[in-house]
From Swiss-Prot:
This is Dual-specificity RNA methyltransferase RlmN. Keywords: 4Fe-4S, Cytoplasm, Disulfide bond, Iron, Iron-sulfur, Metal-binding, Methyltransferase, rRNA processing, S-adenosyl-L-methionine, Transferase, tRNA processing. CDD domains: Radical_SAM (cd01335). Its cofactor is [4Fe-4S] cluster. It comes from Polaromonas sp. (strain JS666 / ATCC BAA-500).
Length: 382
């Protein structure tokens, strides 16, 4: 079996080249061809010696994700469904803005955390993605978008690990993928523009601070443990006090001077004025220890299995005002891609359990998505 070169960061690729009897600097050339130019054929790499290209052809390949379908939202958001084998599907979403392009990518097929408000969690957990499967979402999206938009310059400026899965429960594959994103010979993204979102795996937050500190977003969703236990089951293992202490430690290494806290607004559950006041007290208590925060209030995207409802916008505005009046920087997330199930918490689409995955792939391959624009894709020609 040949090696998929998307599985390697630059150091790993250098070791691979040495194993072929080549100098380490060849890895830099190869890395640029793969990630900056989107090459998938060694024959394209004209500045590499023919002998090296022949070695690579016999021992390696560059395999991107298998695209099942592409969905285009009326607001410009694009969602791809990728088949990663054995009935597992993952999704990535591109969100265009006037000043940036953000790609939301997955780290696992499914998710084991099981947050009550997240449809992905209701799908269940299948497996961790490999480094190559994580990186390939960016590799495919960046080079597809350049073709699609007719642009030579970089399209994706921000990456958020907010797709399917808990990134810090796939740590060994996540960190090399982050290094590829950050490497100047790869995508050259700023640490400030790569965000890992976590439900609160405390030991891995500490490791990430040492190994590859990028922007951190924490799914908080409640001001006290009893409520968070019911919404984010991982809280029973890593309660709020431990989580915020880890965030304070992380901030010393973080590329931004604050930690973002995500808060999904659930009608009658966590959106009352007393919840906002409890959050203010909680953050003021930890700010004395050096924690600086920003809150991102997220409108809930309903799905039948949750039994939850979205907070009314006046309620969200009142909640935000309490936080802002206390000096906490607060934003309300604008939902994007709702019409293609690409918004936050919707990245399982219509998957409610593992048995429906095969039916879902088959339906989408046939373009049977009830009015959603579907483009069945082969390779990069989407």
């Amino acid at each position: 079996m040949t090696a998929n070169l998307l599985d390697y960061d630059l150091e790993g690729l250098a070791a691979f080249c040495e194993g072929l009897g080549e100098k380490r600097f060849r890895a830099t050339q190869l890395f640029r061809w793969i990630h900056q130019k989107g090459a998938s054929d060694f024959g394209q790499m004209t500045d590499l010696a023919r002998s090296l290209r022949e070695k690579l052809a016999g021992s390696a390949h560059i395999q991107g994700p298998k695209v099942v379908s592409r969905h285009d939202s009326a607001d410009g958001t694009i969602k791809w469904l990728f088949d990663v084998g054995a009935g597992d599907v993952i999704e990535a979403v591109f969100i265009p803005e006037t000043d940036r392009g953000t790609l939301c990518i997955s780290s696992q097929a499914g998710c084991a955390v099981g947050c009550r408000f997240c449809s992905t969690g209701h799908q269940g957990f299948s497996r961790n993605l490999t480094t190559g499967e994580i990186v390939s979402q960016l590799w495919f999206a960046e080079h597809f978008l350049r073709q699609h938009l007719g642009r030579q310059e970089r399209v994706i400026s921000n990456v958020v690990m907010m797709g399917m899965g808990e990134p810090l429960q796939n740590y060994s594959q996540l960190v090399p993928a982050l290094r590829v994103m950050l490497d100047d010979h790869g995508y050259g993204l700023s640490r400030r523009r790569v965000t890992v979102s976590t439900s609160g795996v405390v030991p891995m937050i500490d490791r990430l601070a040492k190994d590859c500190p990028v922007a951190l977003a924490v799914s908080l969703h409640a001001p006290q443990d009893a409520l968070r236990d019911s919404l984010v089951p991982l809280n029973k293992k890593y309660p709020i006090a431990e989580l915020l202490q880890a965030c304070t430690r992380y901030q010393a290494s973080a590329p931004r001077d604050f930690i973002t806290f995500e808060y999904c607004m659930l009608d009658g559950v966590n959106d009352q004025p007393e919840h906002a006041r409890q959050l203010v007290a909680l953050m003021q208590n930890h700010s004395a220890g050096g924690l600086s925060c920003k809150f991102n209030l997220i409108p809930f995207n309903p799905f039948p299995a949750s039994g939850l409802k979205r907070s009314a916008m006046p309620q969200v505005a009142a909640f935000a005002k309490i936080l802002m009046d206390a000096g906490i920087v607060t934003t309300v997330r604008k939902t994007r891609g709702d019409d293609i199930d690409a918004a936050c918490g919707q990245l399982a689409g219509d998957v409610q359990d593992r048995t429906s995955v095969d039916r879902r792939i088959a339906a989408q391959r046939q373009g049977m998505l009830g009015g959603i624009k579907v483009v069945v894709a082969k390779g990069m020609d989407v």
